[in-house]
């Protein structure tokens, strides 16, 4: 039944994704983060105090998320096994973000194909932290490809990884880790101290999933009739060409599969950030690379699900 729950949740995400106005645990986690952050900032003022308070915030948010998920699931199972199973499917469904990621990328791709640069910049600004107001088509394409490649890890592979390790409650706890990093894990002055623990722990949580993404995206590239060998080679060569210890693993693999170059200089919060280049520019990046990257994302997602199901079956057999 557990494996069936995984599969149904994955299929639901593939077909419908997260309905825009439905209640979603990430929104609840976000409200909890805002509430706890407000308390921390009220009592902590020095950088040292903010770092300690940020660590306490991380423990409270992640612990509360895991505890609530475990409690709701246990209560539902006690009421009726089928209710418990349905709640498990719903929880898994909410931690997967494949369809939402694909939709967000396509929302940028669509106006770009229609030469509506202003609209594509607006839609891109919803999913990236960089300044999009002056970006040209090539830069927009690059930003979308990077976003899909990076979020293949924390939107799909990592949730499935923690689902395999500890069931739906641990997958929900990972989502809290990821949401904390998204909200406070920045390096600029406002969040540098309070978000330090959140940023570091997100790096720790994604360490293995990011490296697994290199292998899965490389295999997916071959299955998608792209260059799987080049994806693995470039992915390995450029795996550290990023300020994050994890992001370049998936981005470099996608760059290698497509034969394009990612990274380079961008503006974040009014500051120019010069990132290393990732990949080899064997050709110019194009709008078609967005749809190719989405296919790679779905390929890696399918392979991850199959891998964890096989591992679960093998461990069950051994036990």
UniProtKB/Swiss-Prot annotation:
HAMAP family: CobD_CbiB. Pathway: Cofactor biosynthesis; adenosylcobalamin biosynthesis. NCBIfam families: cobal_cbiB (TIGR00380). One of its GO terms (biological process) is cobalamin biosynthetic process. This is Cobalamin biosynthesis protein CbiB. Its main location: membrane. InterPro entries: Cobalamin_biosynth_CobD/CbiB. GO terms for molecular function: ABC-type vitamin B12 transporter activity; threonine-phosphate decarboxylase activity. GO terms for cellular component: plasma membrane. The chain crosses the membrane at residues 56-76, 82-102, 153-173, 204-224, 296-316. Coiled coil: none annotated. It is a multi-pass membrane protein. Converts cobyric acid to cobinamide by the addition of aminopropanol on the F carboxylic group. However, the true cosubstrate could be (R)-1-amino-2-propanol O-2-phosphate, leading to cobinamide phosphate. Keywords: Cell membrane, Cobalamin biosynthesis, Membrane, Transmembrane, Transmembrane helix. Belongs to the CobD/CbiB family. It is found in: Cell membrane. It comes from Salmonella arizonae (strain ATCC BAA-731 / CDC346-86 / RSK2980).
């Amino acid at each position: 039944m557990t494996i069936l729950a995984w599969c149904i949740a994955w299929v639901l995400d593939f077909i419908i994704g997260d309905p825009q106005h439905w209640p979603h645990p990430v929104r609840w986690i976000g409200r909890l983060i805002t509430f706890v952050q407000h308390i921390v900032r009220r009592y902590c003022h020095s950088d040292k105090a903010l770092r300690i308070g940020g660590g306490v915030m991380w423990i409270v948010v992640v612990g509360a998320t895991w505890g609530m998920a475990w409690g709701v699931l246990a209560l539902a199972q006690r009421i009726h096994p089928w209710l418990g199973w349905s709640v498990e499917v719903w929880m898994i469904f909410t931690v997967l973000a494949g369809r939402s990621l694909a939709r967000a990328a396509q929302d940028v791709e669509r106006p770009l194909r229609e030469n509506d640069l202003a609209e594509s910049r607006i839609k891109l600004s919803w999913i990236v932290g960089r300044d999009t107001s002056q970006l040209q088509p090539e830069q927009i394409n690059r930003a979308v490809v990077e976003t899909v490649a990076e979020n293949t890890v924390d939107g799909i592979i990592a949730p499935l990884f923690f689902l395999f390790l500890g069931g739906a409650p641990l997958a929900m706890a990972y989502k809290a880790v990821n949401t904390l990093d998204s909200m406070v894990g920045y390096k600029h002055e406002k969040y540098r101290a309070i978000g330090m623990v959140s940023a570091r722990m997100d790096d720790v949580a994604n360490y293995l999933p990011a490296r697994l993404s290199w292998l899965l995206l490389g295999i997916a590239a071959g299955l998608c009739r792209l260059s799987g060998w080049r994806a693995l080679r470039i992915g390995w060569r450029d795996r550290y060409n990023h300020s994050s210890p994890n992001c370049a693993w998936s981005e470099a693999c996608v760059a290698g599969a497509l034969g394009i170059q990612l990274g380079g200089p961008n503006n974040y919060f009014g500051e120019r950030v010069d990132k290393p280049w990732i990949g080899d520019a064997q050709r110019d990046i194009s709008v078609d690379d967005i749809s190719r990257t989405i296919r790679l994302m779905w390929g890696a997602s399918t392979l991850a699900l199959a891998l964890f199901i096989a591992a679960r079956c093998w461990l069950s057999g051994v036990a």
